[in-house]
Amino acid sequence: MKVLLCWSSYFDVTEFDPQNKHMDPNQRPNVELAATQHRELVDIYDQLGLDVYLAPPVSKLVDMVFTANLGVIIGNKVLMSNFTPMRRREESEYFASFLRKLGYLPYHLPQGIFFEGAGDAIVFGDKILCGYGFRTSKRALAYIEHLMDREVIPLQLQYPGGGKRILYHLDTAGIFMEDAETVILYPGALTKESLRRLEKVANIISASYEDANNLALNAVVVPKTEIWGHFDKVKNEKASLAHFALGMWPELRGVVVTSGLASQDLKKKIEKCKYMPVTVDLGEFLKSGGGAFCLTKIL
């Protein structure tokens, strides 16, 4: 399993965002603590046996650490993002150039059709689950379906109401376990029609708004088939424990890398799906509304 991350050297919160209420320039992240948290995430991936690629950061692109948003990838084709926030729009050309060097073929949407990568387009078996309504235009879905030659399941995101924060990307609303055909989802993130549509292709386990708001649903699923190594040769304690558990309990499907703020209830639901939760403190990135999945582009 190949993953692309970007060093957090220039990560910052420099403005308010009308949709992402986590962002407050009066509560900016601690750069050194963010780097430590990001380093642990990289180490866990590396010691689980994943192929980790690291993109060098660009000083003025303070959000590019959230590599999941760069586009959607199937095979060697990449449909690059058209970001809604102005501050992120230069990321697309940078990552397109970076991915070309890795052998990928970048494609671009017409101007005015917004799309924010794996934040909203999540590969799920032979389909693509695609959120729209806040950061991704509904018109983008037809382009994704045509280019990737996969059925796209349109899922409209909605205001959850009751003073709750908007879950502006699909990846903030659920953990998508394609091999288990299961999604652990905060159902209030989707319209009723979209929820019914998702129920036709996945088993849905309800999660709390609190776990969604803490970005604990913004998690990376690592199947057992992608994990390599042995627990006694791994230095990171969490990765070592994962290797040990997978060796002891063959029925486990893999691990789910999630936030250290994940509730006990959520951890039990992950375990019920035969995955082991591996938690990482990513509190500095929560200040920008991001979690483990946002920080990780699965190649």
Identify the meaning behind each predicted range.
Residues 1-299:
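The feature marks the mature, well-folded catalytic cores of soluble enzymes
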